[in-house]
Amino acid sequence: MTRGLVFFVSTACGILADQLSKFIITANLATGTSIPESGFFQIVHVHNTGAAFSIFQGHIEWLIAASVLGVILAMTAFFIRKKLPFLDTRPGLIALGVILAGTVGNLIDRVRLGYVTDFIRVGDFPTFNIADSCLTVGVIGLLLLYIVSSHVSGDTSENV
């Protein structure tokens, strides 16, 4: 599989997993209800008009603009990946692909519904969804790849 295909397949799989999971939750669980009703791990159906940790509540236009910018940045990174050796690898392109998937997954909700469907609650952590997980895992993956590639290439500069 070519590296470009790796990027697009990881993006498509992430978007599909996000949108399918939200469809299943919306079709089977009333807003505000959870399974189980209490406990450390719950599946709960909530609408979030904000971003992570519910910041920017009610500012959908800013969140849509930020998401569009995120899509542009991810696509730009894909097209200039040859200049970023840590990114021009299968793991780098998978990480970038799931970042794009998370951004697009939540952007679809915001444009279509005016909010994001969240449904995973773990302990006291704010409720989140598959798109949020894609973003988090992708960003952490890219950071780790960057750090490892910096050490491997012998870059010891403090200007990171």
UniProtKB/Swiss-Prot annotation:
The chain crosses the membrane at residues 5-25, 60-80, 84-104, 128-148. One of its GO terms (biological process) is proteolysis. GO terms for cellular component: plasma membrane. The keyword Transmembrane helix applies. The keyword Transmembrane applies. PROSITE patterns: SPASE_II. Belongs to the peptidase A8 family. This is Lipoprotein signal peptidase. Its EC number is 3.4.23.36. It is found in: Cell membrane. GO terms for molecular function: aspartic-type endopeptidase activity. It is a multi-pass membrane protein. This protein specifically catalyzes the removal of signal peptides from prolipoproteins. Keywords: Aspartyl protease, Cell membrane, Hydrolase, Membrane, Protease, Transmembrane, Transmembrane helix. Signal peptide: none annotated. It catalyses: Release of signal peptides from bacterial membrane prolipoproteins. Hydrolyzes -Xaa-Yaa-Zaa-|-(S,diacylglyceryl)Cys-, in which Xaa is hydrophobic (preferably Leu), and Yaa (Ala or Ser) and Zaa (Gly or Ala) have small, neutral side chains. Pathway: Protein modification; lipoprotein biosynthesis (signal peptide cleavage). The active site is at residues 118, 132. Its main location: membrane.
